[in-house]
Amino acid sequence: MGIKGLTKLLADNAPKSMKENKFESYFGRKIAIDASMSIYQFLIVVGRSGTEMLTNEAGEVTSHLQGMFSRTIRLLEAGIKPVYVFDGKPPDLKKQELAKRYSKRAEATEDLSEALETANKEDIEKFSKRTVKVTKQHNDDCKRLLRLMGVPVVEAPSEAEAQCAALCKAGKVYGVVSEDMDSLTFGAPKFLRHLMDPSSKKIPVMEFEVAKILEELNMTMDQFIDLCILSGCDYCDSIRGIGGLTALKLIRQHGSIENIPENLNKERYQIPDNWPYQEARRLFKEPLVITDEKELDIKWSSPDEEGLITFLVNENGFNRDRVTKAIEKIKVAKNKSSQGRLESFFKPTANPSVPIKRKETPVNNAKETNKKTKAGGGKKKK
């Protein structure tokens, strides 16, 4: 879920903290990517038609591999250096949110059965996507693929977004890529949305800067975290009836969550029983992340050509010629990206962002083409 309504809230109340950039402007940048979010999107859109998905001869889904392979090559060709961060064990406080997601998938499965009986194509498409879940096998497949491509993988001890934010704060990467806004709540200095969107969407990258958010909202980081918890996060229920704008007013008026309940109209607003907002706050401020330099030895290397052929072609039915051509693209791209950005050699100049007006762009509001990508493989699975 991320932080409910945060994009709109920032667009309306902290517009200078957001700017639109071209995809190509991130040449030479190292970026940390929330892997699970990307895999989820690939499973939803890549090669999908109704309930049909790309598979290998064993009937195993390969949409995530095709999406990860082609999208990562696009990043490399643009001179971008990706680091994929995978989720570890979720915090106990997230169990309630995960249970809700499980229930929603179960409901969608029932709705899908009804849609299949009535042959309603629109409902089949809609409910089929709602049943998607990223599994351990999907994650393991993508880790293996990325390592064979020479792209670094970080396995977070807990939340991937928290680890991404830690990498960014440590200066290991320029920014964090995800679609969930809680990367900002974890304190990621720079947060990027839409960088992983397909080129066919032609949506600019939206860059958020947490320092400017705090400046425009006139808040401390602690107050921003409280604002996000009040707005609605994955770790605890919010106060019923309070949305982002009301949460903003309350934090500005009272300073922290501690001072809010006693000043609320209890008839109008319902405070959850056993509300663990303090534990949620602690998870945002002190998440479980890797900080040891030895464990974060992030390096990009040459692709393992033989390994990629074995994994993609022999094991997963990808087209050999397309994979071979894709490998050549990776090699050319890595030579290109080694040139680096100019500021690596010269003193950087200021690049002030231009404030933008509020412009909400729904995630996944356009269907990705079902045509096979250049390194595609597999067949449809019903």
Swiss-Prot record:
Residues 372-382 have a biased composition (Basic residues). Gene3D superfamilies: 5' to 3' exonuclease, C-terminal subdomain, 5'-nuclease. It comes from the Eukaryota. GO terms for cellular component: mitochondrion; nucleolus; nucleoplasm. It is found in: Nucleus, Nucleolus; Nucleus, Nucleoplasm; Mitochondrion. DNA binds at residues 71, 159, 232, 234. The keyword DNA-binding does not apply. InterPro entries: 5-3_exonuclease, 5-3_exonuclease_C_sf, Flap_endonuc, HhH2, PIN-like_dom_sf, XPG-I_dom, XPG/Rad2, XPG_CS. Residues 339-382 are annotated as: Disordered. Belongs to the XPG/RAD2 endonuclease family. FEN1 subfamily. This is Flap endonuclease 1. It comes from Glycine max. The lineage of its organism: Eukaryota, Viridiplantae, Streptophyta, Embryophyta, Tracheophyta. The gene is FEN1.
